[in-house]
Structure formats: structure tokens, C-alpha cells
Regions:
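Feature captures the catalytic cores and cofactor-binding loops of soluble hydro-lyases/lyases
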Residues: 1-128
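A hydrophobic, small-residue-rich beta->alpha segment in the mid-to-C-terminal subdomain
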Residues: 131-136
Length: 136
């Protein structure tokens, strides 16, 4: 667990990301649509796409997303990629599970292209609405 205390439990809200190698005309469009759609008691799931062309060490989660999701009642976030802003997320008490930290955000590195779709993290299929329980 990168931030928060105790057990994280909620219903999966997986997104799909793709690696990009230049800045889009309008960044974060897919991310913002997903952020609008995620709801109370859901877990925002972001697979790193590391086995499908994702080779950037960019953080998939940080303080701004944590703040927005905490105020929406989202249960937490789960990624098999890096996260950033860990001190600020810990201060918020928002539960985030990730594998490492990175100061880089996803702009010009990844784009969220779909949300509330099936995902795979470390060989585990995660479908929208699956119950996720995480603890350290």
C-alpha cells in the first residue's frame, strides 16, 4: 500500500491505457471522462500496460486524482505501475496500491482510452464490478 491505512474494499472500475509518444492536442481527455464516471465505493484500477508496449516509467496515480476521488467517495486506487505524490496522498488518507514511485505523470506517455472495461493486472482478470479487497 502506498497510502492510506487498513483494508481497501470496493467494486472494480478498470480503465485501459495505451502508450503514446507525443503530447496529444488535448491531454487527459480519457482520464477526465473516467474520473467523471467512477463512483462511490468503486476502486479505480489502472493496469500499467507494461506487457503491451508500455515502457514509460510514468506514474498512473497521484495527489490530484486522489483528492478528486476521495471527495466522490471512491474506495481507492489499484495499479501495477508507479504512483507519485505519496506524501500528499498519505496526508489525504486515500488508499492507493501501486508498485513503485515516479515523479513523472502520464502526459505525453500514456492516455486512458476506455473506462469501465475488463483489465488484467499480473495475470489476474479484473472485470467491472468485481469485488476488490486489498490489504498489506
Amino acid at each position: 500500500m502506498i497510502s492510506g491505512d487498513g483494508v481497501m474494499m470496493g467494486y472494480a472500475f478498470p480503465v485501459r491505457v495505451e502508450a503514446v509518444y507525443k503530447a496529444p492536442d488535448v491531454p487527459y481527455v480519457g482520464l477526465l471522462k473516467a474520473l467523471d464516471a467512477v463512483g462511490r465505493d468503486q476502486v479505480y484500477v489502472t493496469p500499467s500496460n507494461r506487457n503491451n508496449g508500455g515502457d514509460h516509467p510514468a506514474a498512473f496515480w497521484g495527489e490530484l486524482l486522489s483528492t478528486a476521488c476521495k471527495h466522490k467517495g471512491v474506495a481507492g486506487a489499484l495499479t501495477d505501475g508507479p504512483v507519485r505524490d505519496t506524501t500528499r496522498m498519505q496526508a489525504l488518507g486515500f488508499k492507493v496500491f501501486g508498485v513503485q514511485t515516479s515523479p513523472l505523470d502520464i502526459n505525453s506517455r500514456y492516455e486512458v482510452v476506455e473506462h469501465n472495461v475488463p483489465a488484467v493486472i499480473d495475470g489476474v482478470d479484473i472485470n467491472p464490478g468485481d469485488l476488490i479487497v486489498a490489504d498489506v
